[in-house]
Amino acid sequence: MPKKPFDPVVRIGLTVLLGGFTLIAGGMFLSRPDRTIPPFSIGSQEGTVVAVHVPAWTSDPDIETLIRRFQKVGASHHDFRSMKVRPTTPDDPATLYREVILYVFSDPQWTEPETLRRYLATQATADARQQLSVEEAAFRREFQRSARAGFTYSLGRTKGWLGPIPDPSTPEQRQNIQILFDDLVPS
């Protein structure tokens, strides 16, 4: 007895089913997360300063990999949108990212928009050589100490480090900071 061919409706149904699975599998493959860097999120961004959150279990070598990826993006095409950073100089379409400063934290409270604004306000006060209140000075120190790493990009030059935010009043050699790369200051 010869085999009976599939009914056209069954054939269409199987084609739709297999096509759907193929589309879903292809979409999942194409939209998979980048596993070469640790998971991260942009907690907040104020102008050129970006607070990045990584999970608490992220190791220093993983954070170094993330910082080096930012360096690679800055060196290759100067467009940090692929790294979830909004343009820092949106008024200039030729150079959307003239300067980017990243601070990496494990504790999400330090990446909140209000916390970053408060830190930047204390930084502006300190830069103006005005006296900070005891509370604000303590907050500033704690914010800087809580950072796990940082990255600075300025017109194609970069600096990356592991450790707290460097205190400009103390030489970096005396701080608990590991400089990964630094070409901000020409040799």
Where are these regions (language model features)?
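Hydrophobic membrane-insertion alpha-helices, especially the h-region
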Residues: 11-30
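C-terminal partner/receptor-binding element of secreted or periplasmic proteins
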Residues: 130-187
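N-terminal Lys/Arg-rich, disordered targeting/topogenic segments
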Residues: 1-9
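Generic detector of low-complexity/intrinsically disordered segments
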Residues: 16-19, 122, 164
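Short linear motifs at secondary-structure transitions and domain/linker junctions
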Residues: 24-31, 75-81
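Ser/Thr/Pro/Gly-rich low-complexity linker/stalk segments immediately outside membranes or between
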Residues: 29-45
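Mature extracytoplasmic domains of secretory-pathway proteins
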Residues: 56-143
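Acidic/histidine-rich, surface-exposed loop or edge segments in extracytoplasmic proteins
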Residues: 43-58
